[in-house]
């Protein structure tokens, strides 16, 4: 009985001591630790060579990578998104067009649309300011640090949240700094 067990376990032991499977070796060389850096340019093997960039292309790239362009882009995007969000929240709010002097009167379409427009514009301005502040500070922090990682968004989130919160006092500024930094870290973790 013991010999049968020893005989049955010998092939299993020999199988585990064998070399790893071929596809495991192939995977290690393609995507694993043994991967080699690419030595040849794609154009040298018959690929489509890319022409050198002209001065105009370089100038446009520099302009689009500048902090000012990123801040303007975030400002416009925040304005559009904030306006849409404001109109949406006004649309589902039951108090839009409500007159406290006459609570039983049904508001007219003009009053409802006026309130929706006011709320949309208010949200649009706030989102635009926050987007521009965050984008500009993140770009400046990234330029100063010389790195593009998650710490940039956390630092710029703290600066932006603190600047917004300091209007209400030091305690609100500290809470705004921590809250916006945590939110930025969570978003950056989720997106990367």
Swiss-Prot record:
Domain of life of the organism encoding this protein: Eukaryota
GO MF annotation terms: mitochondrion targeting sequence binding; protein transmembrane transporter activity; protein transporter activity
Similarity comment: Belongs to the Tim17/Tim22/Tim23 family.
Disulfide bonds: 67-139, 158-177
InterPro entries the UniProt entry points to: TIM22
This protein's name: Mitochondrial import inner membrane translocase subunit Tim22
GO biological process terms, semicolon-separated: protein insertion into mitochondrial inner membrane
Post-translational modification: Disulfide bonds promote efficient assembly of the TIM22 complex.
Membrane-crossing segments per the record: 72-92, 123-141, 168-188
Subunit structure: Component of the TIM22 complex, whose core is composed of TIMM22, associated with peripheral protein FXC1/TIMM10B and the 70 kDa heterohexamer. In most cases, the 70 kDa complex is composed of TIMM9 and TIMM10 (TIMM10A or TIMM10B). A small fraction of the 70 kDa complex is composed of TIMM8 (TIMM8A/DDP1 or TIMM8B/DDP2) and TIMM13. The TIM22 complex also contains AGK and TIMM29. Interacts directly with TIMM9, TIMM10A and FXC1/TIMM10B. Interacts (when oxidized) with TIMM29; interaction is direct.
Role according to the record: Essential core component of the TIM22 complex, a complex that mediates the import and insertion of multi-pass transmembrane proteins into the mitochondrial inner membrane. In the TIM22 complex, it constitutes the voltage-activated and signal-gated channel. Forms a twin-pore translocase that uses the membrane potential as external driving force in 2 voltage-dependent steps.
Record keywords, A-Z: Disulfide bond, Membrane, Mitochondrion, Mitochondrion inner membrane, Protein transport, Translocation, Transmembrane, Transmembrane helix, Transport
GO CC annotations, alphabetized: mitochondrial inner membrane; TIM22 mitochondrial import inner membrane insertion complex
Chief localisation class: mitochondrion
């Amino acid at each position: 009985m013991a010999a049968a067990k020893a005989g049955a376990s010998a092939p299993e032991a020999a199988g585990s001591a064998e070399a790893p499977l071929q596809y495991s070796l192939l995977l290690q060389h393609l995507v694993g630790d043994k991967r080699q850096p690419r030595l040849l340019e794609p154009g040298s093997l018959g690929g489509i060579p890319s022409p050198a960039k002209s001065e105009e292309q370089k100038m446009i790239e520099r302009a689009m990578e500048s902090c000012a362009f990123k801040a303007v882009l975030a400002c416009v995007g925040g304005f559009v998104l904030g306006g849409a969000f404001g109109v949406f929240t006004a649309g589902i709010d039951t108090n839009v067009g409500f007159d406290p002097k006459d609570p039983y009167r049904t508001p007219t379409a003009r009053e409802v649309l006026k309130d929706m427009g006011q709320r949309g514009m208010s949200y649009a301005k706030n989102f635009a300011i926050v987007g521009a502040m965050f984008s500009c500070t993140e770009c400046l922090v990234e330029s100063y640090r010389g790195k593009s990682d998650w710490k940039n968004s956390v630092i710029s989130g703290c600066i932006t949240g603190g600047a917004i919160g300091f209007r209400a006092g030091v305690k609100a500024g500290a809470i705004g700094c921590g809250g916006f930094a945590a939110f930025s870290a969570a978003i950056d973790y989720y997106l990367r």
